[in-house]
Amino acid sequence: MHDRTFHIETFGCQMNVNDSDWLARALMERGFSPAPFGEARLTIVNTCSVRDKPEQKVYSLLGRIRQATSKKPDAFVAVGGCVAQQIGSGFFSRFPQVRLVFGTDGLAMAPQALDRLVEEPDLKLSLLDFSEDYPERDAVLGQGAVPASVFVNIMQGCDNFCAYCIVPYTRGRQKSRATGTILDECRALLDRGAREITLLGQNVNSFGQDSHGDGTTFAQLLHKVAALPGLERLRFVTPHPKDIAPEVVEAFGTLPNLCPRLHLPLQAGSDRILKLMGRRYDMARYLRIVDDLRAARPDIVLSSDIIVGFPGETEEDFMETMDALETVGYAASYSFCYSDRPGTRAEMLPDKLSREVKLERLERLQTLQNRLTERCLQDMVGRKVEVLLEGMSRKPGDEGDSWQGRDPYGNLVNVALPQGSDVRGRFLPVVVAQAKKHSLLAEQAGAPW
């Protein structure tokens, strides 16, 4: 009997995390067993190439895998995700232990390929072709109940081709998933215990607006999913500001289970830089969307992505981004220094900034964001919210057990409960007692349900 142990390492976005979760369930249904790093025969690396740093981490990890499995002569590696799509079969020559490379559309066929590789030790395979339609996967939920908070893919790829972004080249052109299939997966998850669903896509607002769509708009999809029995909370990521429709904005005011938090990537606060980036909106348009969202749902919380040091960014441009953070008052922003991505338009732009300038600006921006985040969390003190409890907190309570979960605004909340409480996957009314740097401390204010 061949060794069928596996271990998965994941880099990058929530879509990658969701892909890895599906792959793990699919492998276990085929008789594979999870094992710790360095002990598994098969190590799968699900990669990200949005920035240079995670790509370099992949190469470093492959070196560590080679060392960790040096005493397992039959050990091998599968590399998936965006770096696999980008580098392709080049992995075979650079890293001999790699025997499978699979792209984002090839994921659906990866379990069958790994079955073959376990049985045929001299075989190497690549699954790098983009499919014409959404690459539908086997419905694999695993054994027992599913987590209370789950993710559902609604589309693959992107047609925006922002100047800095490699995603359209590594995940392919946009392909919307069939509405009926999405709803079927949501129902199955709810039947197995899910209570919160997050819809995933590179640009969810353009769902259905491609040759693979069935005429359903994203706003219509939101209403269909929100109406499913048993769904207590609904979220989605990631929208593009240029495509956000009035009907989506209105949904925040009309759908009671649509959570009042939205990740709305700005990328830069300078109109000149936004134009160079190819974002196809300006600050005036973005701020109108923010105003409309707050009119529809006054308590909505916003977060963003910010790129610091885009080619040609002046100090004045950067200060406009800083002003934008203050004006919007983001609860959080995911900020990073610009890095060239191969094949993108921005790679060819002149006036690249030095690493020192980019890092100095990033530090200033993150200092400002930390202050804004602390202010947003402080505003929660004294409020009563319901927390979906995910598990035990790493920080033990002074008395009893300490649990953690998320409130409707996406804040991480820690709460002390009597020892032995069985509340995983349940909602708990709490009153926020204290704001920490990146989380909240709360006290129980009602019975779990």
From Swiss-Prot:
Principal location class: cytoplasm
Catalytic activity: N(6)-dimethylallyladenosine(37) in tRNA + (sulfur carrier)-SH + AH2 + 2 S-adenosyl-L-methionine = 2-methylsulfanyl-N(6)-dimethylallyladenosine(37) in tRNA + (sulfur carrier)-H + 5'-deoxyadenosine + L-methionine + A + S-adenosyl-L-homocysteine + 2 H(+)
Any single GO CC term annotated in Swiss-Prot or TrEMBL for this entry: cytosol
UniProt KW S-adenosyl-L-methionine keyword: yes
Names of the cofactor(s): [4Fe-4S] cluster
The entry's keywords: 4Fe-4S, Cytoplasm, Iron, Iron-sulfur, Metal-binding, S-adenosyl-L-methionine, Transferase, tRNA processing
Protein EC: 2.8.4.3
PROSITE patterns: MTTASE_N, MTTASE_RADICAL, RADICAL_SAM, TRAM
Sequence ranges assigned to domain TRAM in this UniProt record: 378-446
Binding residues for [4Fe-4S] cluster 1: C13, C48, C82
This protein's record includes keyword Metal-binding: yes
Family to which this protein belongs: Belongs to the methylthiotransferase family. MiaB subfamily.
Functional note: Catalyzes the methylthiolation of N6-(dimethylallyl)adenosine (i(6)A), leading to the formation of 2-methylthio-N6-(dimethylallyl)adenosine (ms(2)i(6)A) at position 37 in tRNAs that read codons beginning with uridine.
Subunit structure: Monomer.
Protein name (Swiss-Prot/TrEMBL): tRNA-2-methylthio-N(6)-dimethylallyladenosine synthase
Gene it is expressed from: miaB
